[in-house]
Amino acid sequence: MTGAIEMPPAHRRTPAGRIRARGAGVPFVGRPGEWNAITDVAGVEVGYRTLIRGEGPLVVGEGPVRTGVTALFPRGRARPNAAAWAGYFSMSGNGEMSGMALVEERGRFDGPITITNTHSCGLARDVTARWLFEHLGDGDKADQPFWLPVAAETYDGSLNDINGHHVKAEDVIAAFEDARSGPIEEGGVGGGTGMRCFEFKGGSGTASRLVDYAGETFTAGAFVQSNFGRRHQLKIAGAPVGVALPLEADAGGENGSIIGVVATDAPMAPHQLKRIARRAAYGISACGGTAGNESGDLFLAFSTANPEAVEAHGGIVTARLLGEEAMSRFYEATIHAVEEAIINSLFANETMTGRDGFTAPG
């Protein structure tokens, strides 16, 4: 008889010691990577800036503040301008993810992804462009390059003074400077600070899956900023737990949003990555979400493979690509990783009270 395989510490708890879903005994399908995080994809780094100040009644411009910024570098902070092939999917378009016209046209984006609150999305985009310019050499600056950065948002106004515009340029830069590989924090951190999910405290969550194909092992990692769902909809590992945890009062129709980012080191072309982004939406469904009328459910998938081909500006390029018959196993890995990332965003959380005493239970 063989003994049970010990669960790695990073699968059980976040770096700050917050419980993750696996640590609480929730069973999931699939084999995660070393950290069960999007950072299992080599080169990917994630950083946060979390802003929590004040309590009591809302005073616009003063607080309470419950917000922040998340930064995600596809090829690490050491290569801030690096491009990646990508695909985009909007399951429900009541939200914003900038730079997607370029992704739809050319199948790529450049530089870091930022995720924040709805009214700080434009600021994050502009600061990213300025920061990228400042990190160029003098010769490159003379060419006056341009960027169309990826910045995404969900609404945190239930807990946060969203119209106070408390995220500043220095906060976006702080998230860049915090970017790292390895295990990353989850829950009420970064852009996820003031978010709610299934009427619990939501926010930042991540997970990964390993995929064996053609004698190689690839990784698919997911990162979400969860801010969607009604309590009764919640499913965990297929069990309808939300119906057993009713609210005292009906909160009305489903609002909120989710931003999902899927990274892989598998060599995929943009059209394949768009198909991956579509499958990420199934991860919401696995948790019980339905993409309500006022929900913005937006997904971006990118590959870290083929850096030379992605960044080539002329000539004939050669790229290594997966055969189409491989895609189904990556679809499955994506769905399971997104599902677990959402549930992790719930588990790795604590009760938060924000503006006007509104409380999101952890």
Annotate each language-model stretch with its function.
Residues 2-362:
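Alpha/propeptide regions of enzymes that mature by internal proteolysis
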